[in-house]
C-alpha cells in the first residue's frame, strides 16, 4: 500500500503544505505555485519580550473574600473579583510593564528557491510517510525535503537543471531585526528579537553548478543543508554552536538519509494499523478528501489520517527538548493564534494522548522535562497567589515557564498541574519503570497533592471543597453580566476539579504503596478522598458540571471537561460507577445535540468519549467529521476559522486506538467499540498497561485472532471470556486473567 499524501497542484496556502520535522527543527513546504518556499521553525525561537514576569503578591489577600462570595452562591461577584486580582494584569506583579501576555512562538523565516522561469509543467508533490521524504517536481526539476532525525538537519536535494534565486525571507515583524548572510558556499540570515533572543539560519550549498551567495545553478544535482540555532547569549555564541555541528557531506543523498530512515522505522514499525484497501490511491489526496466531504467513503484515507498523525508525533518529538505547542513545531506567523502557547486545560495534554498506546513513550519525556522545569516557578506561584505549598500552573505558558496568570478568567483555575499527574502515572503504568516512578512521577504527583492539602477548604457540613474552581473556559447564565464580558464562570468544586483531585490522590496512594514510601501521607490523602465533595447528578440525569444545577451559557460548549472521569481519566466506568457513567452519557449527548464538538480537538475528545462509551459507530463518525470539516488538504487539524492546531490530529488517532483496545483501569477490553464500517482489519503493536504488547485481527466485525506479548508486570486482565493459549489462565467475575513471564507470547483464539 502506498503511504503517500500526493497532489498535482501547488499548495496555495500554508495550511495545505507538507510538514517535515524532527522535533528541534521543522519545515513546511508550500510553494504556492511561484517557486519553492520552505517555512522554517526552531522549537526554541521565541522573542523573550515577556520572559521575565512574576506573580502579584497582592492577589492573595483577596482569596478569603472570593471564597466567601462563591461559597454563598454569589458567583458573579466572586468571579469578577477573582478576574480582577488573579487573571491577566491583576495576577502579574505591578512592577512589570506592558500588557499581560504569553511570548509568541516565532518563525525562523522562509527559505525560497525561485527559478528564473516557472511554468509548473507536470506538477507533482507528495509526502511519503514511509520515508519522511517530501517531494516536489515541476519543469523537469525535483526537490526532495527531509528533516533528518539522526544528523539533526534539514535537507533539500535538487535533481535536474536549475537556475534560481535563493535566500531567506521574513514577514514584517516589528520585534525582529535581521540581516542576510552570504558567502561562496552558504547563505542564511542572522536575527535578533527585541526581547533579546538571537538566532541564525545557515544553509550550506553543495552543487555541481555554481553559487554566488544569492543565485544557484544546478546541472544535475545539488544539496542544501539547513541548520538553525537560537540563544540569549549573543550572536557569536549562536554561530559557534552552528559551527560545532557542521560535518562533511560526502555521501550520496540516499546514503546520507539512510540512518534517519532506519531510525524512523525502528520507532514507527512498533505499531501498524491495516484496514481494507480501496482503489483510491491513484487519486490526489485533496480530491479524495473532497469526495469524503461530499459523503463518499474511503477507508484508505482513514488509514492515511492515522498514519499521518503517527508521523506527526515522531516529527514533532524525536529530537525535541521542548513539548509540542498548539501548532506542534510548525508556525509561519510573527503573531500566531494564541501565540502558539502551551494550553494546560486540554490542548497540550491531547498532543500526547496516543503516545503510550502507540509504543512512543519516549515522546512523553520532553513533556515531563518541561513540566519538571516549571516546578520552581510553580512553587513560587502557589505560595504567592494562593498561600499553598506544592505547585500551581497557570492555564497558559510558554518556554519561559513563568506560571504567571496571563489570561483574565481562564487563568483562575488550579487543575492544570493535576492533569499532568495522570500523564506521569500513565507512563509508569505502561512502562513499569519503577525508577521513573520513584525519581520523577511520584515526586511530581506528591507536589500536586501537597497543593490540594492546603487549597481545599471545609464547608459547614465538613465536606472538602475546591474554591475557587471552574470548568475550563465554560460559563453559566447566573455568572453573565450585561455590562461586561465574563468569559469563564467560577464556582465551588466543578466536576473537572473534583475528578482531578480524586485521581491524583488515588494514584499517589498507589504509587506510595508500590514504592514503600510516605506511609504517613497515605492516610492524609485517603482522608481527603473520603471527605471530598463527590460528583453529582442533576434532576435531568446529567452529570453536574458545576456544584449545583446551573443553566449553561453555551449548552454546546467545545470543552468536555466535566467528562474527564470517562476520558482521559477512565475511573468512571459502566461496571464500576454505572450511575455516573449513565449521567456522563446524558451530559455528552446533550452537549452534542446543541452543537458541541465544533473544533477539531473537541471532535477528537468526542471520538475518545464515544469509544469509552462503547459506541463505535459514533466514535467513527467523529473521526470522519474531523477529516471532512476539520482537516486541511494535507490533513492538518483545523480550528475555527480554519487555522492549523495540531492537538486534534493526536486526539483523532487516540480515538481510533480506543475503538480497538480499551485499557483504562486494571482491565483490557479487546475491540470495545469497533465501528460497523471497519469490518475487517488488523493492528499490530498496541501497548498495554503492564508493559505488554497486543496485536489483533478482526473479520466481519469480530475478533478473529491475536496475540499478547507479556510485559514486565507478568499479567493481563482481559474483559470477558477470552479463549487463550499459553501462560496460566483463570476466569473470574466475567474476566480472563493470564499470567506469564515477560516476553511470553499468548495466543488469542477468540471471544
List each model region and its residues:
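Acidic/histidine-rich catalytic neighborhood
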Residues: 447-511
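Well-ordered alpha-helical segments within folded domains of soluble proteins
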Residues: 345-356, 414-425, 496-506, 561-570, ...
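Acidic/His metal-coordination segments adjacent to aromatic residues that form catalytic metal sites
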Residues: 328-339, 393-412, 469-493, 629-641
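Non-catalytic carbohydrate-binding regions of carbohydrate-active enzymes
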Residues: 425-431, 436, 448-458, 521-553, ...
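Alpha-helix capping and helix-loop boundary segments enriched in small/acidic/polar residues
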Residues: 338-342, 355, 404-415, 431-443, ...
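Core alpha/beta catalytic barrel or barrel-like domain that forms the active/cofactor pocket
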Residues: 384-386, 413-426, 462, 467-470
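Short, glycine/acidic-rich hinge or "gate" loops at secondary-structure transitions
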Residues: 320-329, 437-440, 457-467, 517-524, ...
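Aromatic-residue-lined binding/catalytic grooves and analogous aromatic/hydrophobic interfacial grooves
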Residues: 1-408, 424-428, 446-449, 506, ...
Amino acid at each position: 500500500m502506498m503511504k503517500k499524501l500526493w497532489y498535482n497542484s501547488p499548495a496555495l496556502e500554508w495550511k495545505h503544505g507538507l510538514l517535515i520535522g524532527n522535533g528541534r527543527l521543522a519545515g513546511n513546504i508550500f510553494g504556492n505555485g511561484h517557486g519553492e518556499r520552505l517555512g522554517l521553525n526552531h522549537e526554541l525561537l521565541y522573542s523573550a519580550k515577556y520572559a521575565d514576569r512574576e506573580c502579584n503578591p497582592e492577589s492573595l489577600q483577596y482569596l478569603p473574600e472570593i471564597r466567601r462570595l462563591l461559597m454563598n452562591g454569589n458567583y458573579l461577584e466572586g468571579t469578577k473579583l477573582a478576574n480582577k486580582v488573579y487573571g491577566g494584569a491583576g495576577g502579574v506583579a505591578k512592577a512589570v510593564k506592558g500588557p499581560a501576555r504569553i511570548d509568541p512562538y516565532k518563525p525562523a523565516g522562509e527559505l525560497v528557491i525561485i527559478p528564473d522561469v516557472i511554468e509548473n509543467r507536470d506538477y507533482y508533490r507528495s509526502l511519503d510517510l514511509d520515508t519522511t521524504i517530501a517531494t516536489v517536481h515541476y519543469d523537469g526539476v525535483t526537490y526532495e525535503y527531509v528533516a533528518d532525525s539522526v544528523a539533526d538537519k534539514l535537507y533539500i536535494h535538487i535533481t535536474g537543471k536549475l537556475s534560481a534565486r535563493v535566500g531567506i525571507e521574513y514577514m514584517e515583524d516589528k520585534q525582529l531585526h535581521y540581516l542576510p548572510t552570504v558567502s561562496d558556499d552558504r547563505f542564511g540570515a542572522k536575527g535578533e528579537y527585541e526581547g533579546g533572543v538571537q538566532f541564525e539560519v545557515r544553509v550550506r550549498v553543495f552543487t555541481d553548478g555554481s553559487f554566488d551567495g544569492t543565485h544557484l545553478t544546478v546541472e544535475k544535482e545539488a544539496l542544501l543543508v539547513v541548520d538553525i540555532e537560537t540563544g540569549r547569549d549573543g550572536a557569536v555564541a549562536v554561530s559557534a554552536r552552528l559551527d560545532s555541528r557542521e560535518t562533511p557531506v560526502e555521501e550520496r543523498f540516499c546514503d546520507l538519509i539512510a540512518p534517519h530512515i532506519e531510525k524512523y522505522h525502528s520507532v514507527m514499525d512498533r505499531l501498524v494499523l491495516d484496514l481494507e484497501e480501496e482503489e483510491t490511491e491513484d487519486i490526489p489526496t485533496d480530491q479524495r478528501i473532497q469526495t469524503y466531504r461530499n459523503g463518499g467513503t474511503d477507508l484508505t484515507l482513514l488509514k492515511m489520517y492515522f498514519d499521518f498523525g503517527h508521523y506527526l508525533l515522531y516529527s514533532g518529538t524525536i529530537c525535541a527538548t521542548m513539548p509540542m505547542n498548539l501548532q506542534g513545531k510548525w508556525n509561519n506567523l510573527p503573531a500566531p493564534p494564541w501565540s502558539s502557547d502551551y494550553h494546560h486545560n486540554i490542548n497540550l495534554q491531547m498532543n500526547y494522548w496516543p503516545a503510550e498506546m502507540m509504543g512512543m513513550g519516549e515522546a512523553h519525556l520532553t513533556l515531563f522535562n518541561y513540566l519538571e522545569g516549571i516546578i520552581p516557578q510553580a512553587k513560587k506561584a502557589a505560595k504567592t497567589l494562593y498561600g499553598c505549598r506544592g505547585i500551581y500552573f497557570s492555564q497558559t505558558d510558554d518556554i519561559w515557564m513563568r506560571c504567571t496568570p496571563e489570561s483574565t478568567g481562564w487563568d483562575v483555575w488550579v487543575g492544570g498541574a493535576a492533569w499532568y499527574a495522570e500523564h506521569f502515572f500513565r507512563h509508569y503504568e505502561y512502562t513499569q519503570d519503577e525508577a521513573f516512578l520513584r525519581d520523577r512521577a511520584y515526586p511530581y504527583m506528591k507536589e500536586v497533592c501537597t497543593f490540594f492539602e492546603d487549597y481545599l477548604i471545609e464547608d459547614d457540613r465538613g465536606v472538602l471543597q475546591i474554591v475557587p474552581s471552574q470548568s475550563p473556559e465554560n460559563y453559566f447564565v447566573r455568572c453573565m453580566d450585561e455590562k461586561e464580558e465574563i468569559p469563564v464562570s467560577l464556582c465551588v468544586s466543578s466536576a473537572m476539579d473534583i475528578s482531578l483531585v480524586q485521581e491524583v490522590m488515588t494514584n499517589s496512594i498507589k504509587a506510595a504503596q508500590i514504592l514503600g514510601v510516605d506511609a504517613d501521607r497515605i492516610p492524609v490523602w485517603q482522608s481527603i478522598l473520603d471527605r471530598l465533595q463527590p460528583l453529582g447528578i442533576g434532576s435531568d440525569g446529567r452529570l453536574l458540571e458545576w456544584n449545583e444545577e446551573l443553566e449553561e451559557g453555551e449548552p454546546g460548549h467545545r470543552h468536555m471537561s466535566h467528562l474527564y472521569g470517562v476520558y482521559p481519566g477512565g475511573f468512571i466506568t459502566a461496571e464500576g460507577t454505572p450511575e455516573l457513567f449513565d449521567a456522563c452519557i446524558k451530559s455528552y449527548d446533550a452537549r452534542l445535540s446543541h452543537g458541541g464538538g465544533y473544533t477539531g480537538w473537541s471532535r477528537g475528545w468526542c471520538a475518545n468519549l464515544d469509544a469509552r462509551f462503547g459506541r463505535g459507530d459514533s466514535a467513527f463518525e467523529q473521526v470522519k467529521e474531523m477529516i471532512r470539516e476539520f482537516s486541511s488538504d494535507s490533513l492538518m487539524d483545523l480550528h475555527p476559522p480554519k487555522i492549523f492546531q495540531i492537538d486534534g490530529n493526536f486526539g483523532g488517532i487516540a480515538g481510533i486506538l480506543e475503538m480497538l483496545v480499551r485499557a483504562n483501569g486494571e482491565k483490557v477490553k479487546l475491540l470495545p467499540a469497533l465501528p460497523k464500517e471497519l469490518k475487517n482489519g488488523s493492528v499490530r503493536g498496541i501497548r498495554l498497561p503492564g508493559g505488554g504488547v497486543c496485536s489483533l485481527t478482526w473479520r466481519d466485525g469480530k475478533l478473529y485472532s491475536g496475540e499478547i506479548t507479556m510485559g514486565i508486570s507478568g499479567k493481563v486482565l482481559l474483559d470477558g471470556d477470552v479463549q487463550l493459549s499459553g501462560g496460566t489462565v483463570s476466569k473470574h467475575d466475567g474476566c480472563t486473567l493470564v499470567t506469564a513471564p515477560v516476553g511470553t507470547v499468548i495466543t488469542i483464539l477468540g471471544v
